[in-house]
């Protein structure tokens, strides 16, 4: 996010899940933009590389709160343990995924930081947005871990 955006009030939501597979299997799902609609509940379609790199732009369509919107994700960082994106889909969000080994499994963490809406209506919208982002994030991580587990051939464990 730009400096002027980071000076405004923002809020953060986070979630984590354990995947019963090695981290590299989860990372492959994260970095393949064509797979995002399979595990991110709001994403309908994407156009982007099979393995994103810093500087890539992934464009797509999403369904947010009943509205179809065009969006894009600018890939900011691709460390060995995850992905950092600047996402613009109705609102701007900095989305970070980190995957770390946990024995034979993987701990997958996701964090979303977004600008808080302002004004009286903004407070109501902010409340609804936080709830939606938390739910969306939990669903995304549930789906991501299940897909990674299925890809690795391990048994899928319900959360």
What do the predicted segments below correspond to?
Residues 12-14, 68-72, 92-96, 107:
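Short, surface-exposed coil-to-beta transition loops
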Residues 64-78, 85-86:
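Helix-adjacent hinge/juxtasegments
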Residues 20-24, 51-54, 77-81, 98-107:
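A short, structured loop/turn motif at beta-sheet edges
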Residues 87-139, 155-157:
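Beta-strand/loop substructures that line and gate deep hydrophobic ligand-binding cavities in soluble
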Residues 1-53, 146, 159:
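Hydrophobic ligand-binding cavity/cleft-lining segments
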Residues 4, 57-63, 83-89:
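Short beta-strand segments that buttress and anchor functional surface loops
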Residues 25-30, 36, 58-60, 75, ...:
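Hydrophobic pocket/interface hotspot
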């Amino acid at each position: 996010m730009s400096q002027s955006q980071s000076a405004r009030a923002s809020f953060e939501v986070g979630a984590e899940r354990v995947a019963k597979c090695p981290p590299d299997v989860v990372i492959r799902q994260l970095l393949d933009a064509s797979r995002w609609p399979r595990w991110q509940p709001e994403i309908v379609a994407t156009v982007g590389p099979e393995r994103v790199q810093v500087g890539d732009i992934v464009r797509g369509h999403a369904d947010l709160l009943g509205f179809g919107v065009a969006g894009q994700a600018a890939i900011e960082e691709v460390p060995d343990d995850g992905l950092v994106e600047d996402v613009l889909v109705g609102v701007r969000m900095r989305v970070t995924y980190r995957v770390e080994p946990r024995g034979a499994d993987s701990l997958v963490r996701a964090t979303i930081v977004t600008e808080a809406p302002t004004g009286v209506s903004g407070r109501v919208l902010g409340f609804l947005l936080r709830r939606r982002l938390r739910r969306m994030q939990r669903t995304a991580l549930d789906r991501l871990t299940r897909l990674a587990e299925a890809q690795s051939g391990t048994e899928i464990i319900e959360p």
